[in-house]
C-alpha cells in the first residue's frame, strides 16, 4: 500500500508560536510514523500548500503520475462533494474535496490515456487502468470491510498525528468506535462500530465502490 498526500500540512494548528515550515515538517514525520504502524510500503508527499488545494490540471497530472508509477488495482480517495447530511453536517475539508475530484479525474481518463499528459510517457510511465476506486466519506456507502482484527492499528496510527490531537487517547478511541454513551451510532459513516452496525462485524470501514 502506498499513500499519496497532496498537501504539506502547513496550516492545521491554532498554535501561534509555530511556523508553517515547522508544522509541515512535524506533520510529515507524523504521517511517516503513522504509515509505519499500519505497514505502508511508501508515503509520497506532493507538497501543495495546505488549505489552498484545487482540483487543478497540475494536481491531476501529479496524481496520474503516481497511479502510473505504482499501478494500483484499487485506489482509495475522499468523497469529492460536500455532504450536508450525516454526522459531519457539511464540515468536509476543502482540500479533501479537491483531492477527491482530482483523483477521480486522474483515474479516468488521465492515468489510462496515452495522449493525456504525453510527457508522462517521456518519463517512462505507461498508461495504467485502475480497476476500482473506493470512496471514503460517501453518504451512501455500499462496501463494508471488516477491520476488527486491525482496529488497534487504526487507533495507534491516528495517535501518531499528535499535532492534530486535542483529545485524550481514550477520547480518540471513543470517536473511532462511534460510541455515543452506551450505544453505537447507527449512521454508516460514524465510527468503525457504527459502520459495522447490523452487519455481523465488530468494526468496519465503509466505502462507495466504483468499478471501471
What are these regions (language model features)?
Residues 1-71:
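Active-site rim/loop-helix segments in enzyme catalytic domains that contact anionic ligands
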Residues 57-212:
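Metal-dependent de-N-acetylase/amidase catalytic core
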